[in-house]
Amino acid sequence: MKEKKKLSLPAWIFIGMLAGIVAGLIFAFAGLGDFTTEWIKPVGTIYVNLLKFLVVPVVLFSIADGVISLKDLKRVGSVGIKTFVYYMCTTALAVVIGLVLVNLFKGSFTPLPSADLGALEYEAKEAPSVMQVIVNIFPSNLLQPMVSSDMLPVIVIAIFLGAGVLASGEKGQKIAELINCMEEVIMKIMMMIIQFTPIGVFCLMTNVVAVNGADIIGKLALIIGVAYIGYIVHVVVVYGLSVKFLAKMSPLAFFKGIAPAMITAFTTTSSNATLPVNIECCNKMGAEPEISSFVLPLGATINMDGTAIYQAVCAVFIACCYGVQLTLGDMAMIVLTATLASVGTAGVSGAGMIMLAMVLTQVGLPVEGIAIIAGVDKIFDMGRTTLNITGDATCALFISRLEREKAARKAAKAAK
């Protein structure tokens, strides 16, 4: 008798998401949004908390192990520079895509009555200065960044730990083995937690749809739709072409392989919480473990393609609401500010809103305009987080291919 083929985890995650949408719509039409917040969302929150508690050990041990695996501090620097350049280029493209799309649709946006605009209130968080960001990257306390999950200092600690082991030669070998063992243990725990992803996804999606269902079909539906068109265009065009021509991989195989991470990001709205799943997906698709361990945690902190599209779309929309016509110079300023802000606000809580406040300030728009879209920010966040982690994965695969080819050239040269 032939055994029934079991459904894969990605299939169960997808089923969980669809079931959550259906259940959420039922609860929304029944007016039971508060019920889902009180009784269903907490189960999803437990799942997200379990993922988040792994983030610091995953980043610390995976980056340290990745640096040690690279075996050469020059190679660490080379991989870091390539990664940073790739992230900056895709972020700039994301802003351009967002601006092009929102300008195509801006004729459909109507200015809000002055009475409504006068009632808007939004307290913007102050964005740190560039020098303050640089200073904060280097921690004065070893444990504080880990306790507060401040990822940039944790990344710096991990890089120094790995570099210190490499510099110690044979004496550092035992520490290298310990770090490798710790990473293995953390990854096993991660795999246990990932098994509960379908349940977590179902609970989170149910609550999001039940609570925001009315808002989705409200007057902000058009701007949400424009943002999501931008997300899809960026994924299909920029990432699809990157995977095909830079990573030398079938885009279909890539999207199939990255699906579990995308669904997890869509429901948790956290790049850091999705990091363990993303690392697992990339390694299965052929990324070099030492590269994915280095590139993905870095990307989860500084790569914000989805957020960049969101900045561009929302800035033009808010300008239209105030009846302000943005010039070509303003558009160029949005591209520059959104691209640089993705690094400038890296690791800062509420980075999306802080970045948008910076963009609005640069082009002379009232920061209070953020209040127009703040109510449905969760809907924007689901798409932009998904885009952010997908970009991280394309980078890991691309850098892995470059490093494999570099190693092959060295081997061929040595064989001569």
Language-model-detected regions and their locations in the chain:
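Transmembrane alpha-helical segments and their short flanking loops
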Residues: A312-K416
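Membrane-water interface of transmembrane alpha-helices in multipass transporters/channels
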Residues: L32-W39, G77, A214-L222, K248-A259, ...
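Internal alpha-helical transmembrane segments of multi-pass membrane proteins, especially GPCRs
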Residues: K52, I81, V85, A221-G225, ...
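Membrane-interface alpha-helices at helix entry/exit sites of multi-pass transporters
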Residues: R75-K82, K188-Q195, K284-A300, L328-D330, ...
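Alpha-helical membrane segments and immediately flanking helix-loop junctions
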Residues: F255-Q311, L336-M353, V376-F398
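Juxtamembrane helix-boundary/capping and inter-helix hinge elements in multi-pass membrane proteins
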Residues: I68-R75, T110, S168-Q173, C181-E184, ...
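Signature of multi-pass transmembrane helix bundles
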Residues: K4, P10-F14, I21-G33, V48-L51, ...
